[in-house]
């Protein structure tokens, strides 16, 4: 599961934090616990245990992913939020600068960082991975 980091202390939009918190709440305990939505069991749906959440826009990433092959797809998608973007060229330069700075010490051209959160539910968590 990927969501925004709800605990980010710097500049962050309230709706982004709330979406991140709602995602964490949905993963644990709601998705895994059959008592929260018994009507779904009656409809034939099963509970699901999410074992990992990767939080984006975090201040303390512990997973760094090479996004060199898709950075421009991300930028172009963000530019489509025309009502939210004042200067699309400045946005592009800021993203390229930030992602290249993070990538520099990892041998990538562009990178994105995530904070990995695990939920083992009595099982050993999976090892960290990097793309």
Go through the PLM ranges and name each one.
Residues 1-131:
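Metal-dependent de-N-acetylase/amidase catalytic core
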């Amino acid at each position: 599961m990927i969501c925004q980091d709800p605990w980010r202390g710097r500049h962050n939009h309230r709706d982004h934090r709330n979406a991140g918190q709602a995602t964490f709440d949905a993963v644990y305990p709601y998705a895994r616990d059959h008592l929260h939505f018994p009507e779904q069991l009656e409809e034939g749906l099963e509970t699901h245990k999410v074992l990992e959440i990767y939080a984006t826009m975090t201040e303390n990433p512990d997973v760094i992913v090479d996004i060199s092959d898709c950075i421009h797809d991300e930028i172009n998608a963000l530019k489509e939020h025309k009502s939210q973007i004042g200067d699309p060229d400045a946005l592009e330069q800021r993203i390229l600068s930030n992602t290249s700075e993070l990538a520099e010490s990892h041998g990538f051209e562009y990178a994105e960082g995530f904070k990995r959160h695990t939920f083992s539910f009595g099982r050993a968590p999976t090892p960290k991975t990097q793309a």
